[in-house]
């Protein structure tokens, strides 16, 4: 599910655990990260590398990733 970053990081700080940020360079990698997070019942942060921005607007990437995160299981969080 798509959540606010504070909804993930505040519990992580209290629970003394890390939340991984994964830079994704394509949809297959993003899907793989989300599926692994779901299997492990762990929150993840999906990012992208700034060097990739000249290849397409960030809005286009967001239009693809946000629906994927919204469809993700309630058992995990994606920000």
Regions found by a protein language model. Give the residues of each.
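N-terminal amphipathic alpha-helix/helix-capping segment at the start of soluble metabolic enzymes
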Residues: 1-21
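Conserved active-site and cofactor/substrate-binding residues in soluble primary-metabolism enzymes
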Residues: 3-4, 24-28, 56, 60-63
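Anion (oxyanion) recognition and catalysis
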Residues: 13, 38, 70
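Glycine-rich, proline-tolerant flexible connector loops at the mouths of alpha/beta enzymes
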Residues: 21, 44-59
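Conserved, mostly hydrophobic/aromatic
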Residues: 23, 33
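Catalytic domains of carbohydrate-active enzymes, especially glycoside hydrolases
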Residues: 36-44
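Alpha-helix-loop-beta-strand connector modules within alpha/beta enzyme cores
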Residues: 55-75
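Conserved small/polar residues in nucleotide/adenosyl-binding loops
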Residues: 78-79
């Amino acid at each position: 599910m798509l959540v606010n970053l504070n909804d993930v990081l505040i519990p992580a700080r209290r629970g003394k655990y890390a939340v991984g940020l994964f830079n994704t360079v394509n949809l297959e990698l993003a899907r793989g990260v989300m599926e692994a997070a779901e299997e492990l019942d762990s929150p993840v942060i999906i990012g992208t590398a700034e060097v990739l921005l000249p290849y397409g607007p960030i809005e286009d990437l967001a239009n693809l990733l946000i629906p994927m995160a919204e469809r993700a299981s309630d058992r995990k969080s994606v920000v």
